[in-house]
């Protein structure tokens, strides 16, 4: 408060003198002479020092001049953002005629507050200060909605700044791409008078980030045909696209292009690491290893890319070998290896020993990602005891209540069948975001507790948490698994007007499943064939085919299988299901022909298996391969003993006897 009064008194004291001809400061001359106050300002490193320099500037009668004030505001707003309050004070009280530099400085400083940014821009227009390209760039950075960027776009056109080169053109394309409006971005790009390599890169990178790899590649070929030479950013995006598409042929071509460009490109670590990642995404671990060995320089990211790549492919032996060779390991290295062993269902003791080596021997502190990796492994393999051990670690590390971890724990307990424990985790979570609510609703859905899921969905909205499209999918799944047809239809029909989401393929799939489970196959078929704005997925035709398994509608079953085979000809499920439907209605000839067609196309039935977690770890029992189990003789003896104990009490044990033999 005292400081504010001091500034105001200083302003009154020097207000009349600022207009005096004898004390008028010449900013050009003073800049050339390197005024001592400005020199001191550049060397400030604390708030108190800044106040002292400000007092000096007031003492030397520079407070009303534009240049020193612009330096003061820039220093307090940008160089040391913690002094933003002082910058605002100086701007409001001591800058009667701010120039474009001062306005840009303030707009940049308050970019986290959209309202303040646009308020400053309005003030700028009122004071007839012409904005430049930096002004519009800062405004776009503060914008979060498409409508705001479009308004800024209009102001840019009116200002004539688009004629100053490609800088603003590229910025507009970038922001439209980031907001997901590819149509407008493409139109802006098409109207650019002279697009350069940066312009093409903005489009290609935007497509690659959003997963539109084919569009990115098409634009790259247009760029080359227009005679524009790609740079390292273009090549980096191409490698990302090759990985997304698993296009090893194109990936090798890009690799060759890098090598032909010489050491400037081939020794670029960012490109080399992207190359390794691309090969792993194309499942070419041998080529990745060869490229890695050829690298003259390797950083931590290079080593981690190799470990993560082998983990993704399930080759834990190779991942461990690379891990052991690492000159230095960070948290990412340990997390990747822990995730790999957990996901593969390795012995719990192996995972725990690795965790203790990480925390006790190497003194690496685990984070949320570490815990989620361990929890996900327990969830995927149904290892409840391992999941409880990880839950204990979460509590001991004082991570309890974190929404991210709580969501993973809820998922784990639900998949292990302990829904009560999952609900307890949900209730004790101190942070409840939309992901946490969605996880609990999903768990209730898959346990057939549809009414509870709907009640929780209602409570979520009462507490002011806005559901997202994943939440709505979980609610539809809950209705489907519990036979709540009308409730599910109500949620689906109000997705747009009440929640602001257009139904996507997954939502339509859940709706079709809901109707099929309720026996309303004709309605489901009508939605798939006539009412959907997108192509039906295999899960939709699979739901319709499953609904016909009673044999009442053979024609619909045949239609569903025909459409299903167009989408996934290599899968055996449709063949087996239709064959069983024919058998149900006594059409054995058609049943046999369906099986023959399956064999003729080279489609093989994948053997099912069951998993049991024992003291020694995870055991898998594959159908028709029980005798290959290492302890089959012991298992058979115990089954025979159980059979002998049960036989005197039950009459219908013929089937069990056959299975044991």
Curated annotation (Swiss-Prot):
Residues 616-647 are annotated as: Type E(+) motif. Its main location: mitochondrion. Residues 540-615 are annotated as: Type E motif. The keyword Disulfide bond does not apply. PPR repeats lie at residues 99-131, 132-163, 165-195, 196-230, 231-265, 268-298, 299-333, 334-366, 367-401, 402-432, 433-467, 468-498, 504-539. Keywords: Mitochondrion, Repeat, Transit peptide. One of its GO terms (molecular function) is RNA binding. The keyword Mitochondrion applies. GO terms for biological process: RNA modification. One of its GO terms (cellular component) is mitochondrion. It is found in: Mitochondrion. Pfam families: E_motif, PPR, PPR_2. Signal peptide: none annotated. Residues 1-18 form a transit peptide. Belongs to the PPR family. PCMP-E subfamily. This is Pentatricopeptide repeat-containing protein At3g04750, mitochondrial. It comes from Arabidopsis thaliana.
